[in-house]
């Protein structure tokens, strides 16, 4: 028979009493009143902050956006199919933030920075707020270094600098994404981290972009943040801020970054959907009153940091889609007024076979030649003016039957210059190649060729120059100026190659 030892039992009880710690936990909770269309109305949550993350009983997370006197409007970051009326909600005390680290390079993520490429988790020891304040006036310095896109028309006439915000605007299917991805490809070896944010795109389009970047080895320095068309509106709205937070992580570590938002029209539509469902009053085109702030607080985060902060930079290329070339619609005018210039892509030019379909006349860069190396300024100075005059003359020439010789020559030169700006997709050019191409056209060396021969001649000239005059590239990359020596080498190469080319064509 087992004997009961009172002293042993009392010592166990005493030990348990000594170990007991009384912990009072105050949890800010609420009850779901109504749920549907990605929105939940919650009663309670008295001390919740605007933008705070809240967690539902079944695990879905949401953001408290509307704080009203008798309920809280929460937007859901998931489908919320298991949330029921009367289920409990608790405030987390946290504002939306994401983990950040170098491990994100080469990966495809969603708006919550979770990998969606099936290559496992990413370890990160640091985190950043998705919405963080933009650098102030003292923290910045003016833009002065070029960010080469590899596209002649842009680098010569609408130059982009590190820390600039340049809008890419145009109708659907005019090559906006192609301009952005070519810019990413051209950053290879330039020590620039790229972030591509796809908002509301088809999953097949995003897969196409990722494949193109992988094939050319560009994913090594690129992060893709994707929320496709079937994602909840909340996540489409958050995706650009997630991309900006990742780019900022590198910017504040003295690195140069490039971020592409493809596209902000879809983000504005997702935000409009959320706002209307939250019963916020609609404004112009049914967008809410703060849609300008939606984009301005995002784009102001792009900056060129001061010397004290390490001179890192974040260059933003937002994309906006227009309907039949209407630049005066609400979202396009908003983003044009926030950015430092725009690249306008025209459907008419695209259909006429001029690709990239950049309308040079109404595209501008408000940073201008400050974002060009001296060699490019020397060569491309007159190019934009000549092309603008050519466009005017061409329109006039349609009505005039007999033109004088000077006008005919100017038209012929203009046609060749336009041909010179055509470029294949995924074939960005180095600065030295661009300088050689522009110099050849602007100085009349192409005038003796047929318009149809220009592109073939220029491709062969660039190869010939690389092979036979490697000093040209060395001079441009080391001195950043178009020296008399470089000019002599280039002229020599052009003369030699024109003879060779004409012999080949006649043969």
Curated annotation (Swiss-Prot):
Stored HAMAP family: ATP_synth_alpha_bact
Main location: plastid
Reactions mediated catalytically: ATP + H2O + 4 H(+)(in) = ADP + phosphate + 5 H(+)(out)
GO cellular component entries: chloroplast thylakoid membrane; proton-transporting ATP synthase complex
Record-linked NCBIfam families: atpA, PRK13343.1
Subunit structure: F-type ATPases have 2 components, CF(1) - the catalytic core - and CF(0) - the membrane proton channel. CF(1) has five subunits: alpha(3), beta(3), gamma(1), delta(1), epsilon(1). CF(0) has four main subunits: a, b, b' and c.
Species, as recorded: Lemna minor (Common duckweed)
InterPro entries for the chain: ATP_synth_asu-like_sf, ATP_synth_asu_C, ATP_synth_asu_C_sf, ATP_synth_F1_a_nt-bd_dom, ATP_synth_F1_asu, ATPase_a/bsu_AS, ATPase_F1/V1/A1_a/bsu_N, ATPase_F1/V1/A1_a/bsu_N_sf
Binding-site residues, ATP: 170-177
GO molecular function: ADP binding; ATP binding; proton-transporting ATP synthase activity, rotational mechanism
Cell compartments where the protein resides: Plastid, Chloroplast thylakoid membrane
Signal peptide: none
EC number: 7.1.2.2
Designated name of the protein: ATP synthase subunit alpha, chloroplastic
Record-annotated site: Required for activity: 363
Top-level taxon in the UniProt lineage: Eukaryota
Function according to Swiss-Prot or TrEMBL: Produces ATP from ADP in the presence of a proton gradient across the membrane. The alpha chain is a regulatory subunit.
Family according to the record: Belongs to the ATPase alpha/beta chains family.
UniProt keyword annotations, A-Z: ATP synthesis, ATP-binding, CF(1), Chloroplast, Hydrogen ion transport, Ion transport, Membrane, Nucleotide-binding, Plastid, Thylakoid, Translocase, Transport
Topology of this chain in the membrane: Peripheral membrane protein
